[in-house]
Amino acid sequence: MTTPVVQARGIVKRYGHVTAIDHSDFELRAGEVLAVIGDNGAGKSSIVKAICGATTPDEGEILIEGKPVRFNSPIEAREMGIEIVYQNLALSPALSIADNMFTGREIRKEGWQGKYLRMLDKPAMEKFARDKLTELGLMTVQSIKQPVETLSGGQRQGVAVARAAAFATKFIIMDEPTAALGVKESRKVLELIQDVRARGIPIILISHNMPHVFEVADRIHIHRLGKRLCTIDPKDYTMSDAVAFMTGAKEPPAEDAA
């Protein structure tokens, strides 16, 4: 069997007397979109935060491509090729599209200007950003130099996704990527997710939107009471089944139980 891109075993995270993650397991396979669903307070965001370094587990281990890792911050995870598209997008409204694409990893000019004056190579950054947006069919903006605050909600989401796809070498985490978007903009984001998957980049998708989950996910990780309840194939179950598993109204089949 192919080694999972990321695997978590027996993860525990406590906040005082509250156990947010209770000996939970997790697995993301190569080239897939894995949706993570669960009721509010189920711990789905907590397990993903543990994987990307936003929190440090109290117990358990995390393996990236079969090798144990321990991230102390999301920056360390990013350096290993793990990108995150946050629900709030983490974009700087006043900065240009190109500047947002390169926040924290700007390209400096060659020679003394870059070495001593730390001058940025704006043309190189703008070309890279333009190329990446074009690859994903997102060059509907007027200019790569325009501030992000002038973009629509869907276009901003596209910039965040393009940034993640441009630099991810392991996988991408997307937190509620269609939240607060209209029908047309949501459709574009779903197409982007499928496009990124087609490029071979696996995705962890956290979402409450069941129709969207069932449309793009290859597998669905159902989280309940701080741990993985089961992982199901959306082709074999209905949205009603998933909600019933998630809320405890229905027991998952024995062969799918984690």
Task: Name each region found by the language model.
Residues T2-A258:
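Glycine-rich phosphate-binding loops of nucleotide-dependent enzymes
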